[in-house]
Amino acid sequence: MKIKIKSTSCNSEALNIYKELLKKYNPVETTIEYYAENYNETYQNPAYLIDVPSLAIIPELAEELEEDIIYRRGSKRGEEGYQEPFLLIYDDYIE
């Protein structure tokens, strides 16, 4: 996979980390859907998901990216609907 990071509002250190993660791990391509109430429309953004357990190998990355790790709220491990936390990297970071 050839990855070139675009210039975005993300700081350069975070972009370098994203680039390394996408090279080293097998990100899952996905689409994130969100509803814009003021436009009454649903939008879809391409994104990549990386399981957080992969980040456990590199603890400083997990700490650096903590704000980007998505947790499904309202459910606990073992309950219906529980999902392991994952790192979300929006496709617009990548060219």
Which residue ranges define each predicted feature?
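Residue-level detector of alpha-helical secondary structure
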Residues: 15, 19-23, 59-62, 66
